[in-house]
């Protein structure tokens, strides 16, 4: 039925880029990537993407002795709510201790299908699709076997569930578990907390805050990884 809830677990890998202004010895110590685990709960109408607290944190699991690079996320865990029927996306996140609710439209991107290219993920045959986002190529792998137009982190708009996404060289999402009929306690929640803002406004505030911190550090260009 339309109200069946599907649950997909994803692992996100974020590749770290030291940037030109980081001292070489610091860049050498910096880990190449870090991982997060997330859960997507979805129906035909909406979805909720949030931090997976059930499974061990992958950073701690792998020894996690990266000192200050372990990058334990301070503040709140980001949550993304997608309302497919009304094409609305809400992202709850924080920036230097202040909570925000980012409201934006949810337009399915103009995906280009590459039906000749396929790969297997968790036993599901997936088809490749791509889109351009500014200068970045986004590659998604979706399976028509799960006939729901859903995906991680607000990605959707393909004729099937998206089980993997790569954002250029910077981030990869990969499904690690698919439950077609989820019967657990977690619920799809529409976030309401936080100062309401647009994506454009949030990015502007973020840039200003990062510049402030840079100035406080004497202009030392420590690259900061903050993502709403």
Show which residues each predicted segment covers:
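Extended soluble regions of mature proteins
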Residues: 3-228
């Amino acid at each position: 039925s339309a109200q069946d809830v599907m649950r997909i677990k994803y692992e996100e890998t974020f590749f770290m880029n030291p940037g030109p202004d980081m001292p070489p010895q610091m860049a050498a110590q910096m880990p190449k990537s870090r991982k997060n685990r997330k859960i997507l709960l979805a129906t035909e109408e909406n979805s909720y993407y949030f931090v997976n607290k059930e499974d061990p944190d992958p950073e701690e699991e792998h020894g996690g002795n990266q000192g200050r690079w372990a990058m334990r996320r301070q503040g709140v865990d980001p949550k993304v709510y997608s309302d497919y029927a009304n094409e609305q996306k809400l992202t709850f996140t924080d920036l230097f201790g202040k909570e925000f609710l980012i409201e934006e439209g949810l337009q399915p991107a103009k995906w280009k299908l590459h039906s000749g290219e396929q790969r297997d993920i968790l036993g599901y045959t997936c088809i490749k699709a791509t889109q351009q986002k500014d200068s970045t190529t986004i590659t998604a792998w979706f399976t028509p076997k799960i006939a729901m137009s859903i995906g991680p982190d607000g990605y959707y708009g393909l004729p099937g569930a998206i089980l993997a996404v790569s954002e250029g060289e910077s981030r990869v999402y990969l499904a690690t578990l698919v439950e077609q009929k989820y019967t657990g306690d977690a619920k799809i929640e529409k976030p309401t907390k936080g100062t309401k803002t647009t994506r454009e406004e949030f990015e502007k505030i973020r840039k200003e805050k990062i510049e402030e911190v840079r100035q406080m550090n004497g202009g030392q260009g420590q690259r900061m990884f903050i993502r709403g």
